[in-house]
């Protein structure tokens, strides 16, 4: 199912490749097993994820399989425009894109390429908000870690 699984604080990050592209990135529970890269693209993705884990300014250069509705793609493009160390609310993106905050949240949750398409930078108006269609558990801890990693702790008084 996954071509590599990389260790991160609060989670494991799994990558699936297909047809020479990264098809999916998933957050797995922290106790999940690691997996060595199964192919050259998985190796490349693992190296770039590990570099990001150590340096939030690291950039990704991976061929991506991006599939979604026109609105989802607009949301994902807007997420990519959010600079590291910054956040936007679901409502702000909704107003910018001419949609509803709930639809933006749905597009964030449907993002199959998190970290590379940084849905963690989209937050609720009153705090962190959900993550990958979750409102608690390790996925929210993962979002908190990503925001802390990118220096957003002060803005949202995140607690570990």
Regions found by a protein language model. Give the residues of each.
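Basic nucleic-acid-binding alpha-helical/helix-turn surface characteristic of O6-alkylguanine DNA
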Residues: 1-99, 150-160
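Acidic/polar active-site rim loop that often engages polyanionic ligands
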Residues: 27-29, 125-128
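Residue-level detection of the helix-turn-helix DNA-binding "recognition helix"
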Residues: 109
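…primarily DNA-binding HTH/wHTH and HhH modules…
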Residues: 126-160
């Amino acid at each position: 199912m996954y071509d590599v699984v990389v260790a991160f604080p609060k989670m494991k990050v799994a990558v699936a490749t297909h047809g020479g592209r990264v098809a999916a990135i998933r957050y797995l529970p922290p106790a999940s097993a690691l997996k060595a890269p199964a192919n050259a693209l998985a190796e490349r993705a693992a190296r770039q994820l590990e570099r990001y884990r150590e340096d939030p300014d690291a950039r990704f250069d991976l061929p991506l399989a991006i599939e979604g509705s026109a609105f989802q793609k607009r949301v994902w493009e807007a997420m990519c425009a959010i600079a590291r160390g910054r956040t936007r609310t679901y409502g702000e993106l909704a107003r910018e894109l001419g949609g509803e905050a709930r639809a933006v949240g749905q597009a964030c949750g449907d993002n199959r390429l998190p970290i590379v398409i940084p849905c963690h930078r989209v937050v609720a108006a009153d705090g962190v908000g959900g993550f990958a269609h979750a409102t608690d558990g390790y996925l929210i801890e993962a979002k908190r870690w990503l925001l802390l990693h990118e220096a957003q702790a002060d803005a949202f008084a995140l607690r570990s």
